[in-house]
Curated annotation (Swiss-Prot):
Function summary: Forms part of the ribosomal stalk which helps the ribosome interact with GTP-bound translation factors.
Gene: rpl11
GO BP: translation
Protein name, entry field: Large ribosomal subunit protein uL11
InterPro entries: Ribosomal_uL11 (IPR000911), Ribosomal_uL11_C (IPR020783), Ribosomal_uL11_C_sf (IPR036769), Ribosomal_uL11_CS (IPR020785), Ribosomal_uL11_N (IPR020784), Ribosomal_uL11_N_sf (IPR036796)
GO molecular-function term, one example from the UniProt record: large ribosomal subunit rRNA binding
Gene source species: Methanococcus maripaludis (strain C7 / ATCC BAA-1331)
SUPFAM superfamilies: Ribosomal L11/L12e N-terminal domain, Ribosomal protein L11, C-terminal domain
Family: Belongs to the universal ribosomal protein uL11 family.
GO cellular component: large ribosomal subunit
């Protein structure tokens, strides 16, 4: 059984037969439109976000299966704030402000894919992502927010 695995990043619910999907799947002998339909069906909840997708193709039987990953933390932060792009100058310009509840919500979504061993550390990873997106947390810069988490200021959210 010869299996080929194609890993791509697609816009949720908006995959097309064009690049990057078409050229990667086309030579493997499966119906590209069926693959696109399946991906769009499985990613429709992530509308507008970049979603990692793994397409596993059995080249002998010409069958496929699709596995959908969780979008990057930066995409989840932007969706939670309702913005399409982060700050162009993250240290000087603020693109938005997350509450600790929103940070914990994102951390719970991503926790299985993170190296963090508890919700508190997963939340700190999400706060770290806020640095590059240019988003503050509870009115503080991400670095200040991480120090506040370490100091126990938000411990009530992690129980």
């Amino acid at each position: 059984m010869a299996e080929q695995v194609v890993e791509i990043l697609v816009s949720g619910g908006k995959a097309t037969a064009g690049p990057p999907l078409g050229p990667a799947i086309g030579p493997l002998g499966v119906n590209i439109m069926q693959v696109v339909q399946k991906i769009n069906e499985m990613t429709k909840d992530y509308d507008g976000m970049s979603v990692p997708v793994k397409v596993i193709v059995n080249t002998d039987k010409r069958t496929f299966e699709v596995e959908v990953g969780i979008p990057p933390a930066s995409a989840l932060v932007k969706k939670e704030l309702g913005i399409t792009t982060g700050s162009q100058e993250p240290k000087h310009q603020v693109a938005g402000n997350l509450t600790m509840e929103q940070v914990v919500k994102i951390a719970k979504m991503k926790q299985d894919a993170m190296l963090a061993y508890n919700l508190k550390n997963a939340s700190k990873e999400v706060i770290g992502t806020c640095v590059s997106v240019g988003v503050n947390v509870e009115g503080m810069t991400p670095k200040e927010a991480q120090k506040a988490v370490d100091a126990g200021q938000f411990d009530s959210y992690f129980n």
